[in-house]
Swiss-Prot record:
Keyword set, alphabetical order: Membrane, Transmembrane, Transmembrane helix, Transport
PROSITE patterns according to UniProt: MFS
Ranges for region Disordered: 527-602
Disulfide-bond pairs as recorded: none
Family from the record: Belongs to the major facilitator superfamily.
PANTHER family: MAJOR FACILITATOR SUPERFAMILY (MFS) PROFILE DOMAIN-CONTAINING PROTEIN (PTHR23504:SF15), MAJOR FACILITATOR SUPERFAMILY DOMAIN-CONTAINING PROTEIN 10 (PTHR23504)
Name of the protein this chain belongs to: Major facilitator superfamily multidrug transporter mfsB
């Protein structure tokens, strides 16, 4: 194996927990801007869905309105379950970026249909359409896994998307409640006998469409493809975004009238400026040099591109659903089931009137805390604020000190006692009940914000290859959607039966039993290193002896002495691990180029 001489070695980037200069901030920020559009749109309907069903006049029984409102909500979840695998596989075939953008467009279409819905069936179809056309939950997890491959960076990165969801889930309901029925709430601004009077719930949906269009534009211009093969394709949207950034920053990059490609003066372009670059795991266009195809530009045929060369050099697609992948998907489904069941049970428990029946301890008792709606809303708002804080700071701290799998198991061990103790809050003195409720809510959110990102990291690292990561995350998203659809339904039935029989603990203890099952199952799970790193290491032998022509500008296969020095000393090229005995670095005069510098996305 070839080792660089000591005098050519430069201090390499460390990827430890204290080195955050290489953290892919820009791409995660762009991804977060795309992500926040969805919870805003999804959660905006909840403040007015009851009044929307009431306006449809489908029933005269007020008690059944909640049932029909639940049907509208569940139609999205079941549709999302049925389409999750499809979108995951589609992202493996055409790339992550197109699927993410199509998901945002599909959500926008469903919001328009929902705003114009004249009856309950149309509203349900609109929500189902949103679930069918949007598979972004699994694809987003895949994209994060491919952007962040340094293990020390994963806890921080995987806490960002849940934080963004929490933020959007606060903005969405506030916006939906404020903009619904504008002719009634803002008669000075919205006149009667207008479109907003005929469709009183159209305005919040139109605003959501504007937000989603913003997400589409941001994604099209600035989001990079992360698929291991599709990222080498030419991306006109990203080129346009880079051109806009360059124009705004006063760069010399310009777009000519005759050529739509971005042209850079070759004498001024610094291809090997590695003064402050990320570690080898991050190959992003925001910091890496633009690479030319492996072949001479002049020798390329119309169908010859980097993506095709990479496909030819890589082995076939490995089996996606290995034993560890299946274990992780099952764990994700179990976690989603009992977590969403708690979210449904706790407001019902808090609002249920106190029972005057005689208690037969330790198991036979009913009733709730009888809290007013305003108090419950404030408690849940406090829970949401704490959730955002815990996502960003608590989860990375805990995982960094205890490890992902160990943390996940500890959380699952603590969770069942919480479920089993919550119904006993009715037995506490009234003066202690409020504090106990806050303690239960904070405990649940603490476990929640640690468990879900942990499963995402474990699942991403268990994937045998990034080429099947989309299918794996699609299956996980479908499993979670099914669990979130079945959980509230089954738990609601158990809670009703428990109140009728006098045992209100039935639903809570059933959730605890499901969690215990997940705890036992977690001991068959194993923690793996990020697969993208091991793939690179495994391919080092196959790349040995191949001329590293793609590291130089188009039409130039050999390096100048200055380029030799920078190439060998760069942190970007892992020549420590390569046999480059066949690498020819003989200095020759560069061949004249008739074409401008060609860019190939890295």
């Amino acid at each position: 194996m070839f080792k660089r001489p000591s005098f050519l070695r430069r201090q390499r980037h460390t990827v430890g927990r204290d080195d955050w200069s290489a953290f892919p901030v820009r791409q995660l920020f762009v991804l977060a801007l795309c992500r926040i559009c969805e919870p805003i749109a999804f959660m905006s309907i909840f403040p007015y869905v009851y009044h929307m069903v009431e306006a449809f006049k489908v029933t005269d029984d007020d008690h059944k309105i909640a049932l029909y409102a639940g049907l509208i909500t569940s139609s999205f979840t079941f549709a999302e379950f049925s389409a999750g695998m499809f979108w995951g596989r589609m992202s493996d075939k055409i790339g992550r970026k197109p699927v993410l953008i199509m998901g945002l467009i599909g959500t926008a279409i469903s919001m328009i249909v929902f705003g114009f819905a004249p009856n309950l069936p149309t509203a349900m179809v609109a929500r189902a359409l949103g679930g069918l056309l949007n598979g972004n939950i699994g694809v987003l997890q895949t994209t994060v896994a491919e952007i962040v491959t340094v293990k020390e960076h994963q806890p921080r990165a995987y806490s960002i998307m849940p934080f963004v969801w929490c933020l959007g889930s606060i903005i969405g309901p506030a916006m939906g409640g404020a903009l619904a029925q504008p002719c009634q709430n803002y008669p000075g601004l919205f006149q009667r006998h207008t479109i907003f009077d005929s469709f009183p719930f159209l305005l919040p949906n139109l605003v959501c469409v504007v937000v989603l269009v913003f997400g589409v534009i941001v994604g099209f211009l600035f989001l990079e493809e992360t698929h291991p093969e599709k990222r080498y394709r030419r991306d006109p949207g990203l080129e346009l975004g880079n051109w806009l950034i360059a124009r705004c920053s006063g760069s010399r990059v310009q777009l000519t009238e005759d050529d739509t490609d971005i042209k850079v003066d070759a004498n001024e372009a610094d291809y090997f400026n590695y003064g402050d670059v990320p570690p080898p795991e991050y190959r992003s266009t925001e910091t890496s040099p633009q690479l030319a195809p492996i072949k001479n530009v002049g020798a390329l045929s119309g169908d010859d591109d980097i993506e095709g060369q990479v496909k030819g050099e890589q082995c076939g697609t490995p089996k996606a659903f290995t034993k560890q992948v299946i274990f992780n998907i099952v764990a994700y489904g179990i976690l989603a089931y009992h977590s969403v069941s708690f979210d449904q049970l706790i407001p019902v428990f808090l609002s249920t009137p106190k029972s005057d029946d005689n208690f037969v301890l330790p198991f036979k008792f009913t009733g709730g805390l009888g809290l007013p709606t305003k108090t419950i809303g404030f408690m849940l708002a406090v829970q949401g604020v704490y959730s955002m804080i815990a996502q960003l700071w608590l989860f990375p701290f805990v995982v960094r000190h205890f490890g992902t799998l160990r943390t996940f198991r500890l959380v699952l061990l603590v969770w069942p006692p919480l479920y089993m103790l919550v119904p006993y809050l009715v037995l506490l003195p009234s003066i202690l009940q409020t504090a106990a409720v806050y303690l239960a809510l904070i405990s649940k959110i603490t476990l929640h914000v640690i468990a879900f990102p942990s499963t995402a990291i474990l699942l991403a690292n268990a994937a045998p290859s990034s080429k099947v990561l989309g299918s794996i995350n699609g299956a996980a998203a479908s499993t979670a959607s099914l669990s979130r659809a079945l959980g509230p339904t089954i738990t609601g039935l158990l809670h009703s039966k428990g109140l009728e029989s006098g045992y209100s603990i039935i639903a809570w203890w059933a959730c605890g039993l499901v969690c215990v099952t997940g705890t036992i199952q977690s001991f068959w799970m194993e923690e793996s290193e990020p697969r993208r790193d091991s793939e690179k290491a495994g391919n080092s032998d196959s790349t040995a002896g191949i001329p590293m022509r793609s590291s130089f500008p188009a039409g130039k296969e050999y390096a100048t002495p200055e380029e030799e020095r920078r190439l060998l000393s760069s942190t970007r090229t892992s020549v420590d691990d390569l046999d480059i005995s066949n690498l020819d670095l003989t200095q020759i005069e560069p061949a004249p180029r008739s074409n401008p510098l060609a860019f190939a996305e890295d």
